[in-house]
Swiss-Prot record:
This is Patatin-2-Kuras 1. Residues 20-217 form the PNPLA domain. A motif (GXSXG) lies at residues 63-67. The nitrogen atoms of the two glycine residues in the GGXR motif define the oxyanion hole, and stabilize the oxyanion that forms during the nucleophilic attack by the catalytic serine during substrate cleavage. Residues 1-11 form the signal peptide.
Length: 374
C-alpha cells in the first residue's frame, strides 16, 4: 500500500513533501493518538533514535478540532526547541484532562460545556508560543462567525497576514470550540500596522467538515511551489506528495437509517446533533473517496494512506464521553485498527503499512539531510 523506496523513487525521495492530517472528533482523538504513538515508535526504531519525533519527518501537519490539538502538541516547542509532547504522551493527556474538559458545567440555554478548563489547560501546556514558532508547517482550521469565513493558521501565511500569528492556545481552543459543545472564542492580535485584529472563532470542523486532509494537502502544494527545496515538484504532482490521513472513527449515526415519520418527531437539538454527526461522517467519506480517486488517477495511489475505523459502536461513537471505561475502549479501537487490513483487496494491515511508511519517512529525511550537506 505504501510506496517502496527503490529504483527511481530514491532519486526524488528527498524532495518529496510529507503531510500528516488528523481529523476532528472530540475525545475520539484517542484513536489517532494511538496510531501516532505506534508510528513515532516505528520511526524511533528505524532510526535508532529514542528522541525522534513526528515533527522531524513531516513538512506539513494539519488538524481540525481535536486533530488541531494533536497538531499543536507535536509541533509546539519546549525550552529545548523540541516538541513539548511525544506521541506517547497524548493518550495520557486525554485520560488526565478529558473528564474535566467534558464535564456538565454548561447551562440548559448555552453550550453543553463552559470550556474554562479546556482553555486553562491549553494555556498551561502551550504557554505563550505562537504559530511562527511551530517546529514544522502547520495547518489548523477554524471559522470566524463574525466575518463568516474560514480561518486557516499556517506559518507560511504569516508574511502576508501577520495577524494570523496567534498564540497556540487560542488557536487550539478555537478549532475545538464545536457549536453546541463549547462557547466560541474571542481574542485579539495585531496587523503589520499595529492595528487590532479581532477573531470570533468556532470549531475548525465548520470550515473543513471534520477531515482536514484536503486543506493540509493544499498547504503542502503551496509550500512545494514556494520553497526552492522542492523545485522539481510541479503543481498537482502527487507522485511527490506523501499523505497520511488519520480519522477518529465513523459514527454509527451515519450508518443508521431513518424514516420521514421518525425524523418528523425530532426537535431542534436532535436535528442539530444528527446533522453534525451525519455531515462529518459523510464528508470524511467523500474526502477519502476524492483523494483516493485523484491519487489513483495520477498513478500515485501508494502515496496516500487513510487510517480509519468504520465500525464504531456504542459509547465510542460519542465525541464527549470521557468516562474512563469509554476512553479505554477507544484505545482498544486504535490498537485493534492497527491489526485490520487496509482494504478488502489487500491482506496488508495498517500496522504493516505504517511500518513501511516509517521506513519511507526515514529514508526521505536522510536523503534530504545528505543533499543539504553538499
Amino acid at each position: 500500500m505504501i510506496l517502496a523506496t527503490t529504483g527511481s523513487t530514491c532519486a526524488t525521495l528527498g524532495e518529496m513533501v510529507t503531510v500528516l492530517s488528523i481529523d476532528g472528533g472530540g475525545i475520539k482523538g484517542i484513536i489517532p493518538a494511538t496510531i501516532l504513538e505506534f508510528l513515532e515508535g516505528q520511526l524511533q526504531e528505524v532510526d535508532n533514535n529514542k528522541d525522534a519525533r513526528l515533527a522531524d519527518y513531516f513538512d506539513v501537519i494539519g488538524g481540525t478540532s481535536t486533530g488541531g490539538l494533536l497538531t499543536a502538541m507535536i509541533t509546539t516547542p519546549n525550552e529545548n526547541n523540541r516538541p513539548f509532547a511525544a506521541a506517547k504522551d497524548i493518550v495520557p493527556f486525554y485520560f488526565e484532562h478529558g473528564p474535566h474538559i467534558f464535564n456538565s458545567s454548561g447551562t440548559i440555554f448555552g453550550p453543553m460545556y463552559d470550556g474554562k478548563y479546556l482553555l486553562q489547560v491549553l494555556q498551561e501546556k502551550l504557554g505563550e508560543t505562537r504559530v511562527h514558532q511551530a517546529l514544522t508547517e502547520v495547518a489548523i482550521s477554524s471559522f470566524d462567525i463574525k466575518t463568516n469565513k474560514p480561518v486557516i493558521f499556517t506559518k507560511s501565511n504569516l508574511a502576508k497576514s501577520p495577524e494570523l500569528d496567534a498564540k497556540m492556545y487560542d488557536i487550539c481552543y478555537s478549532t475545538a470550540a464545536a457549536p453546541i459543545y463549547f462557547p466560541p472564542h474571542y481574542f485579539v492580535t495585531h496587523t503589520s500596522n499595529g492595528d487590532r485584529y479581532e477573531f470570533n472563532l468556532v470549531d475548525g470542523a465548520v470550515a473543513t467538515v471534520g477531515d482536514p486532509a484536503l486543506l493540509s494537502l493544499s498547504v503542502a502544494t503551496r509550500l512545494a511551489q514556494e520553497d526552492p527545496a522542492f523545485s522539481s515538484i510541479k503543481s498537482l504532482d502527487y507522485k511527490q506528495m506523501l499523505l497520511l490521513s488519520l480519522g477518529t472513527g465513523t459514527n454509527s449515526e451515519f450508518d443508521k437509517t431513518y424514516t420521514a415519520e421518525e425524523a418528523a418527531k425530532w426537535g431542534p437539538l436532535r436535528w442539530l446533533l444528527a446533522i453534525q454527526q451525519m455531515t462529518n461522517a459523510a464528508s470524511s467519506y467523500m474526502t477519502d473517496y476524492y483523494l483516493s480517486t485523484v491519487f489513483q488517477a495520477r498513478h500515485s495511489q501508494n502515496n496516500y494512506l487513510r487510517v480509519q475505523e468504520n465500525a464504531l459502536t456504542g459509547t465510542t461513537t460519542e465525541m464527549d464521553d470521557a468516562s474512563e471505561a469509554n476512553m479505554e475502549l477507544l484505545v482498544q479501537v486504535g490498537e485493534t485498527l492497527l491489526k485490520k487490513p487496509v482494504s478488502k483487496d489487500s491482506p496488508e494491515t495498517y500496522e504493516e503499512a505504517l511500518k513501511r511508511f516509517a521506513k519511507l519517512l526515514s529514508d526521505r529525511k536522510k536523503l534530504r539531510a545528505n543533499k543539504a550537506s553538499y
